[in-house]
Amino acid sequence: MEKTLNLVKNDPWLEPFAGAITGRHQHVLDKEAELTNKGKQTLSDFASGYLYFGLHRTDKGWTFREWAPNATHIYMVGTFNNWEEKAAYKLKKQKNGIWEINLPADAIHHGDLYKLNVYWEGGQGERIPAWATRVVQDEQTKIFSAQVWAPENPYKFKKKTFKPDTNPLLIYECHIGMAQQEEKVGTYNEFREKILPRIAEEGYNCIQIMAIQEHPYYGSFGYHVSSFFAASSRFGTPDELKALIDAAHEMGIAAVSYTHLRAHETDSYL
């Protein structure tokens, strides 16, 4: 017999929907148990997976990791190997569905495009890595690919710590691409230079940036997210976004953003 949630007990109007509410609640608990390995780690640990997964520069070169428990083979393909499957770019399967490859420093370079060729029982396909931090769209084919983002002189935040004034918190909702007067897609730099000063002048201390993660359909206002860890390349580079956030903090303005995922295979994560 299912246990009645206090939420339903406290609100009789919810009784007709008790089954659906209880089912959804249990689904959340089951998913949390899966993501936290039954409580052996926290949701914060899971959310920090980008520090471990994805492409990272190391003292010896590069390390790339992906979680793909149902895969049988995975190759990294890109402009660095003419998009061909090479033994040198084949990932090795580790424990718990993790795949990994270590590459020398000259194997890939800043600006290279790449994807994963993933094989599974009965199928195969190209996929953008789940933890890609930079994804760009080809102007001709309109196809999205991950991009290596490792500039020689990456942007360094000038304001190391920041705590906004929340008494009260005055939030200005904005969209980077639609904030300009011109009929075009605005940029991070334009927003920083032209819009932020006006927001500060009006007395706001927080900007809620409408979904800023990479999304294939611009008309979704950014809410068809395909890559959680990649800021939209339509508006500029990761470093230009950092400069925008830095400038906001200098003006006493906090920055928040929220969104949800898009269900699609070829331009989304694994």
Language-model segments: residues:
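The feature marks proteins involved in alpha-glucan
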Residues: M1-G61, E84-E85, K90-E173, M178-E183, ...
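Short proline/glycine-enriched turn/loop motifs at strand-loop junctions of beta-rich domains
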Residues: W67-H73
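Short, acidic/polar
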Residues: T187-R198
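Conserved small/polar residues in nucleotide/adenosyl-binding loops
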Residues: T259-T266
